[in-house]
């Protein structure tokens, strides 16, 4: 092992073939014995947060990374051997093909480790992979050497050798473009002809009689089933390309025993699949172009609306080519599609029908989107929402998911005493002391899914810790000043804090008229709030608009969430955490109104439940589709 390793100035490793349940903590436990680690990141899907099956581990020293690569490659984590290689951030080096070789006709028992052990004798290997599907090895793989010389040595020595009693082919890796160019050149000089659609009464002799007139045939074969019956297709291999070409030109489309036969160049399975895929994509693109701007998506349909009623409602706006209500088990799914003959008619229908009440429900009408467009739009909305919600704060917002990377702190983090308490204990936790959290980082592996964390003591830091007043949530000028000017030294005195607060402008917040309160005068002592409308939740102190305005922005949502959670839990105990997180995206003034108005709160909760149920139904449908292999529209 060479600690200097001039080829790898970075100490970053790629870890692939991970089990879906592997986390950053597991990888840290696995790789930390090799040396100090800077960070670990398991790559996840942006929306579902499911693992993509690979991760990056960044060491402080290249020598430690190389030690991990040499000693831990193909080690088993959660029942799966992991594949480790250097993280190559320059895609041109990965795609250049220099030092990369291709091996085929591998025995099914040969895995990544066996292939690595076999070829490591020829030089330093950057990556090694046997291509697999759900049934195991597909019989071929790739080995990427550090140098082209090592790759050439491996080709010279291993091509044609026996591996597990099978003769393997080892050659230079060729890109798809190179392979397609070679296939195209070979296709022009074909000698093998494919014939189909000639019925069950055809045999080898009769097929040779039909095609022998075009030239010398090396072989003729009619494919048969287990009972010896013709399967309706076969092959004729000619000695010369000219004879094969003439047979295709003359015989394709001719009647043979009353059937029009197909005669063409014989293709390999991969080539045929590629051609069919290209044709399918072209048809799909043509269909998208044809229906662009004329196909409408209609939802919130009454259960009694069928295809005829849907067509009747939209007929006044133009010529309809199709109208369909989507059904399941004979019942309407509540949405459908209407296709017009021109974009102008479709636009008019959207303008007139969107929001119109048909039967008992207001319709939602919009241009239909493809699944890919819809997912891209939802992803964009999600990212914008996350960008607007997240604020720079050393303490993680308890209603947001934890960070996706695992960072190693320079000092051991203080033990986090914050936990997920049942709602009944929230009131007991409120009078607990609160400390400045500057510089502290909460433990990255708290289970935050589907739960909200009540206010709890935060990890101490190196600044002077000082509990606030025992009067809950009534903030003095001293508290406001300290909140807005957190530093790593001792806190300013009461007089200094009061002077500072007099200079700084307190942010103004707008609330609905029903919950607006007169501004309190700030002084240096905690005081009891004046008489004003307050939200009362059993077991918690009243919440007023002025109390909310006095709190730092990052704490306002937490204060509202702690009061919303028990109310929502009384309606939907199992979904309370998720619904609370969804409602907290609403403006604070509306949340205060919902706390005062049970009817408004119940309405919003019902909407959130409907969204969750629709999302769960969609996920279940996608699982069924992926299990059955039936493509969705």
From Swiss-Prot:
Tree of life domain: Eukaryota
InterPro entries listed in its UniProt record: Nucleotide-bd_a/b_plait_sf (IPR012677), PABP-dom (IPR036053), PABP_1234 (IPR006515), PABP_HYD_C (IPR002004), PABP_RRM1 (IPR034364), RBD_domain_sf (IPR035979), RRM2_I_PABPs (IPR045305), RRM_dom (IPR000504)
Keywords: Cytoplasm, mRNA processing, Protein biosynthesis, Repeat, RNA-binding, Translation regulation
Residue stretches making up the PABC domain: 540-617
Keyword Transmembrane: no
Subcellular location as annotated: Cytoplasm
Residue span of region Disordered: 452-473
One GO molecular-function entry: poly(A) binding
Compositionally skewed regions (Polar residues) per UniProt: 461-471
Regions crossing the membrane: none
This protein's record includes keyword Glycoprotein: no
Subunit structure: The C-terminus self-associates, interacts with dazl and interacts with the C-terminus of epabp independently of RNA. RRM 1 and RRM 2 interact with both eif4g1 and paip1, and the C-terminus also interacts with paip1. Interaction with eif4g1 is necessary for translation of mRNAs required for oocyte maturation. Interacts with the translation termination factor sup35/erf3.
PANTHER family: RNA BINDING PROTEIN
Protein known as: Polyadenylate-binding protein 1-B
